[in-house]
């Protein structure tokens, strides 16, 4: 059994009840890691012996970020589309087809290189758990290989065959839904933990969304969905009704939507993706409204080549505080424990005995600096499963 002690921690965010406030903060603390798990958390003056030691030098230590919404399997980029939006063209989601064409044409090695590059990029910024969706293949073999490549770097894989109706089915959306619920789901399910649907105008309506999610649940996949990004719609309430783990975007909400999420009691998380609003110059979700209603909120990057090409959870924290009226403490919780809740995980997003030893050491004395110093590389060191991964 190997052991590692991280000591001289000035501020330890545990996300557990034993510490102070909603982040369970402990001062002058230490963490013992054994065989990839947190074995002990306690005061720095009484640390247990360990084989190795990392001196945090009085800095803040946090659980690794849990990015519960990302699209990392794709080819090409859409920089020209971004420039056009910044010049005033509206975002409608149609650029997804551009990425579908490039992804279908790419080799496995080309897609693998992109996935690994973005996964490494995220890890260097403190993300130790990332959900990865398919959705840029939209054929049985392309969706299956997307999930297979995603599974090489993450245990959280999501089948998003219902990202958009591809061009070859434009006049036959019912036939495409049949393909998604039939051969595509059968091929994808062994490689996925979740099923997702883009429930928006121009993509999939409520009836199609219900049919696809219900088929996925019958195949043993957990449900989650994109909802209410481009305008008000049925997605949020449908997600709550079907017991989805998370409804994502939540930009345009009615009072009934908020009430439904609050009534879910945390079983359905509202995952907010401020990188998308930043990159599309769109109105941000009202996180304050959700939090004040008692809704469980997560933050994620929505990393994708079209509407949110960022892998940075610290950037999303800063946006959430500046643009969505979250406090720094709320944003950090949403980016760690909130993301874990959106994935229905209890082994990540916290630093408590038995949890996975995923943590980051900041080049800062407090978690507040993640929002206070936007754009600054504050992640000094990352541990994943108790193993030091990178030291920028």
UniProtKB/Swiss-Prot annotation:
Domain of life: Bacteria
Keyword Iron: yes
Ligand binding (Fe(3+)): 69, 71, 226, 302
GO MF annotation, one: zinc ion binding
Gene Ontology biological process terms, A to Z: L-histidine catabolic process to glutamate and formamide; L-histidine catabolic process to glutamate and formate
EC numbers: 3.5.2.7
Cofactor note: Binds 1 zinc or iron ion per subunit.
Compartment annotation: Cytoplasm
Entry binding sites for Zn(2+): 69, 71, 226, 302
Location (main, coarse): cytoplasm
SUPFAM superfamilies linked to this entry: Composite domain of metallo-dependent hydrolases, Metallo-dependent hydrolases
Pfam families per record: Amidohydro_1 (PF01979)
Cofactor needs: Zn(2+); Fe(3+)
Function of the protein: Catalyzes the hydrolytic cleavage of the carbon-nitrogen bond in imidazolone-5-propanoate to yield N-formimidoyl-L-glutamate. It is the third step in the universal histidine degradation pathway.
Annotated family: Belongs to the metallo-dependent hydrolases superfamily. HutI family.
Protein's recorded name: Imidazolonepropionase
């Amino acid at each position: 059994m190997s052991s590692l002690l991280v000591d001289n921690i000035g501020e330890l965010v545990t996300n557990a009840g034993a510490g102070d406030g909603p982040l369970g903060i402990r001062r002058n603390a230490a963490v013992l890691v054994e065989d990839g798990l947190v074995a002990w958390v306690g005061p720095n003056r009484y640390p247990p012996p360990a084989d190795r030691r990392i001196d945090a030098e009085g800095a803040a230590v946090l659980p690794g970020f849990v990015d519960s919404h990302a699209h990392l399997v794709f080819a090409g980029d859409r920089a020209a589309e971004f420039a056009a939006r910044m010049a005033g063209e509206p975002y409608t989601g149609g650029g997804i087809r551009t990425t579908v064409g490039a992804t279908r044409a790419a080799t496995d090695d080309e897609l693998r290189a992109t996935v690994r590059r973005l996964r490494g990029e995220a890890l260097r910024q403190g993300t130790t758990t990332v959900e990865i969706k398919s959705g840029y293949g939209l054929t049985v073999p392309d969706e299956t290989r997307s999930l297979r490549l995603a599974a090489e770097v993450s245990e959280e894989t999501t089948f998003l065959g219902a990202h958009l109706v591809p061009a070859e089915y434009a006049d036959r959306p019912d036939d495409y839904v049949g393909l998604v619920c039939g051969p595509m789901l059968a091929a994808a399910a062994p490689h996925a933990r979740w099923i997702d649907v883009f429930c928006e105008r121009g993509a999939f309506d409520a009836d199609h969304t219900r049919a696809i999610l219900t088929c996925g649940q019958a195949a043993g996949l957990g449900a989650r969905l994109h909802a209410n990004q481009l305008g008000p719609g049925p997605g949020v309430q449908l997600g709550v009704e079907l017991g989805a783990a998370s409804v994502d975007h939540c930009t345009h909400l009615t009072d009934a939507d908020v009430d439904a999420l609050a009534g879910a009691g945390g079983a359905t998380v509202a995952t907010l993706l401020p990188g998308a609003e930043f990159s599309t110059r769109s109105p941000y979700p009202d996180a304050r409204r959700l939090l004040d209603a008692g809704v469980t909120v997560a933050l994620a990057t929505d990393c994708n080549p079209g509407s949110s090409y960022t892998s940075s959870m610290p950037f999303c924290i800063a946006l959430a505080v500046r643009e969505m009226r979250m406090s720094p403490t709320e944003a950090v919780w949403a980016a760690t424990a909130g993301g874990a809740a959106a994935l229905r995980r209890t082994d990540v997003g916290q630093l408590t005995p038995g949890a996975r030893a995923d943590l980051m050491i900041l080049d800062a004395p407090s978690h507040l600096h993640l929002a206070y110093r936007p754009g600054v590389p504050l992640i000094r060191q990352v541990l994943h499963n108790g193993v030091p991964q990178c030291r920028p």
